[in-house]
C-alpha cells in the first residue's frame, strides 16, 4: 500500500497517477449537515446557494478523481452530509455522465468484510437518530475494466 494524499483536483500528481490506482477515496467538502447534533449553528449558515456551490465543487472533484483508478479500480465517494443533493444526486449525475462506471452495493461490500449491514440499498448511510453517530454517506463506484 502506497497512500497518496491529493488535496485538490489540480494537484500535479493527478497526471502522473492517472489510471494507476487500485482505490481512491474522495472525502468531499460538504455542508456537514450530518454533524448538526454537535454543531447546531450550521443550520443558520446553510443556504440553497451554498448547497448548490458545494454540489458543483463535489461533482468536479468526483469527476477529476475518476481519472485515477485503473480499469476495474474503485472510487469511494463520501460526505458527512445528509442532503440527497450532495450524496445520491452527485453520484447519480456522475454515473449518467460516465458510461461504464458501476455503482456497487456498499452494504454488501461491508458485509463481506464482516461489518454489520449499514445502509440503504446501494449506499452506506449512517443516520444520527438510528446509529447514534454523526450522519455519513458513502458510495462505491467501479471503473469499467479495460
Please name every model-derived segment:
Residues 1-146:
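S-adenosylmethionine
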Amino acid at each position: 500500500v502506497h497512500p497518496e494524499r491529493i488535496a485538490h483536483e489540480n494537484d500535479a500528481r493527478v497526471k502522473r497517477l492517472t489510471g494507476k490506482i487500485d482505490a481512491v477515496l474522495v472525502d468531499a467538502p460538504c455542508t456537514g449537515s450530518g454533524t448538526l447534533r454537535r454543531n447546531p449553528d450550521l443550520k443558520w449558515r446553510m443556504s440553497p446557494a451554498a448547497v448548490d456551490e458545494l454540489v458543483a465543487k463535489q461533482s468536479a472533484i468526483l469527476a477529476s478523481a475518476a481519472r485515477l483508478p485503473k480499469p476495474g479500480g474503485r472510487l469511494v465517494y463520501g460526505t458527512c452530509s445528509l442532503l440527497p443533493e450532495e450524496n445520491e444526486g452527485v453520484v447519480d449525475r456522475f454515473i449518467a455522465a460516465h458510461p461504464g462506471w458501476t455503482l456497487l452495493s456498499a452494504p454488501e461490500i461491508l458485509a463481506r468484510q464482516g461489518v454489520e449491514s449499514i445502509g440503504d440499498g446501494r449506499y452506506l448511510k449512517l443516520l444520527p437518530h438510528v446509529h447514534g453517530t454523526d450522519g455519513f454517506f458513502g458510495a462505491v463506484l467501479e471503473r469499467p475494466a479495460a
